[in-house]
Amino acid sequence: MTDMLTTSRRPETPGQFLVAALYHFVSFPRFADFREPLQAICDANGVKGTLLLAHEGINGTIAGTEEGIAAVLACVRAQPEFAGLIHKESRASAMPFLRMKVRLKKEIVTMGVENIDPKKVVGTYVEPKDWNALISDPETLVIDTRNDYETAIGLFQGAVDPKTKTFREFPEWVRNNSGLHNKPKIAMYCTGGIRCEKATAFMKEQGFEEVYHLKGGILKYLEEIPPEESLWEGACFVFDERVSVTHGLQEGEHTLCHACRQPLTPEDLQSPLHEEGVSCIHCHDTRTEEDRERYRQRQRQIMLAKKRGARHLGS
C-alpha cells in the first residue's frame, strides 16, 4: 500500500464537475460507524456518487464542485486509517451521478476468496512511465482484470482478456489456465488500480512470484502518457454517465444501453437493432416483447422528465 498523500490536480473549467476516484486497502474495523457522517458530509456539499466501506478499507467514485470534493476528501483523510489516501481526478461536462450512496460491504471490491489481503501481500507497483517497457518485454504476460463489457471497448496491446462477467470469476479463470505459468512475469491492470491490486495478492497466493500491477490503473496511464507514446488501444470504460474516457481523461464517444448496460459506439447507434432505452445490438435477441414494452414505458418517462428539465432516476 502507498503511504503518501498525493493527488492529480487538473485545471478547473467553468461549468464542469470534478470527478474523484479513490480506494485504500487498510484495516478499518469501525467502518460501519463512519457511514452516516460520510453520507452527511457528501449530502451537505452536493457531492454524488458511490462510496463503499468495509473492514478492508474504502473504494468509490464521487463527483461535485471543487470545494465539495475537497470537503469530502478532507473528511475521509481525517480518519487516521485514510491519512495516506490517494485519489485520481478527471472532469465531466455534466453531473455523472444521480444520487449519493455510502454502502457497507464485506469487501470493497468483491473477489469472494477468503484470506486474500493486499495489506499484507501484493504485487509490485509499476508507474505509468515504466509500464510500456514492462508489457513490451517478451517475458511478460499482460492480463486485464476487468469484465468483458469493459474490455470490449479498450485494451493494452497484447493483453490477455479473461472475458469474465464479474471479478468473482477471475480466481476460477486463473486456476483453469495452467499456461499462465509459462512466462516468468505477470503484469496486471484495471481501471483505477483496485481490482488488479487485489488480483496480484491472489496471484501471489497461487504461487506466481514475479507479479506487477499498473499504479493508478488505466486512468492514471491515460492522464500521464501522451497518445503518441501510448500502448493503450480504444477507450476506458468508467462506471458513471460519461461511460468512457480517452487520453487526457477526456470524455469518450460511447453511450450506454439502458436495457443491458453495455457500452455503445456511435456506429452501434445506427444499427436497426438499436432502440434508445429499449434494446441494442448486444441485447436485442435476448429481450421479450414484454421486456421491450416495459423499457419503452420507462424511456417515455425519461423523455418527459428531460422536457421538464429534470432527471429520471431510471435513466
UniProtKB/Swiss-Prot annotation:
Native organism: Rhizobium meliloti (strain 1021) (Ensifer meliloti)
Annotated GO biological process: tRNA modification
SMART domains in alphabetical order: RHOD
Domain named Rhodanese: residues: 136-230
CDD domains xref list: RHOD_YceA (cd01518)
Family: Belongs to the TrhO family.
InterPro entries associated with the record: Multihaem_cyt_sf, Rhodanese-like_dom, Rhodanese-like_dom_sf, TrhO, TRHO_N
A Pfam family it matches: UPF0176_N
Record keywords: Oxidoreductase, tRNA processing
GO molecular function: oxidoreductase activity, acting on paired donors, with incorporation or reduction of molecular oxygen
Active site: C190
Descriptive protein name: tRNA uridine(34) hydroxylase
Record field: catalytic activity: uridine(34) in tRNA + AH2 + O2 = 5-hydroxyuridine(34) in tRNA + A + H2O
Enzyme class: oxidoreductase
E.C. code: 1.14.-.-
Primary role: Catalyzes oxygen-dependent 5-hydroxyuridine (ho5U) modification at position 34 in tRNAs.
